Amino acid sequence: MKIVGDSEHFKQPYDSNDEYVSKTEDKRDCEAAQKVGMELVSLSKTQLDKIELDEHLYDSIQQAHKIKPKTEAYRRHMQYIGKLMRNVDIEPIKASLAVVLNKNSNETAKLQMFEKMRERLLTQGDGEIQTVVEHYPQLDRQKLRTLVRQATKELAKGPESKSSKELFKYLRSEIQD
């Protein structure tokens, strides 16, 4: 009886020195590509224009904006976008996406900072005006004091006031951090 050892006949595809990718790994990669596609669909047109995409992929994302979410057609279209994403190098898209999303979070943080500053100005009065003017010397103290006074008077009458909005706009336009 002849014992057959490591013959070519018994070798499996994963026995070679090539890197073997399991089905599970392949599925994970496909799902990751589809998630990136979903993030791209959630962006606005101006944000999407900042990311360099394949023309066919860009058109598909634009079509996804026209389909109602939570429908079967939307789900199928998202799978199609995932399929297109598998044929494209995802890393540069992820990097561009991170830049676009980070810029948005920075903008939101700035607006929240102005909102908090306005609230402090309205609640603490002249002491806070002095602190803000010392920190941001480009602000006109007299105009700031006038806006705070008007907004405080209007807030006593009702919740949102025109002067309060003007104060916010003034802070946002004058402070460039």
Swiss-Prot record:
What Gene Ontology cellular component terms go with this record?
cytosol
Chief location of this protein?
cytoplasm
Q: Which GO terms describe its molecular function?
A: ribosome binding; rRNA binding
UniProt xrefs under CDD domains: YjgA-like
Biased composition of type Basic and acidic residues is found at 1-12
Task: Tell me the segments the record calls region Disordered.
Answer: 1-26
Q: Which Pfam families match?
A: DarP
Family matches, as InterPro entries: DarP (IPR006839), DarP_sf (IPR023153)
Regions annotated as coiled coil: none
Q: Which GO terms describe its biological process?
A: assembly of large subunit precursor of preribosome
Compartments in which it is found? Cytoplasm
The answer to whether keyword Chloroplast applies is: no
Any idea which UniProt keywords this protein has? Answer: Cytoplasm, Ribosome biogenesis, RNA-binding, rRNA-binding
Q: Does the keyword Cytoplasm apply?
A: yes
Output the NCBIfam families linked to this UniProt entry.
PRK05255.1-1
Its biological purpose is as follows: Member of a network of 50S ribosomal subunit biogenesis factors which assembles along the 30S-50S interface, preventing incorrect 23S rRNA structures from forming. Promotes peptidyl transferase center (PTC) maturation.
Tell me the protein family, please.
Belongs to the DarP family.
Q: What is this protein called?
A: Dual-action ribosomal maturation protein DarP
Source species:
Shewanella oneidensis (strain ATCC 700550 / JCM 31522 / CIP 106686 / LMG 19005 / NCIMB 14063 / MR-1)
The lineage, from the top, is: Bacteria, Pseudomonadati, Pseudomonadota, Gammaproteobacteria, Alteromonadales
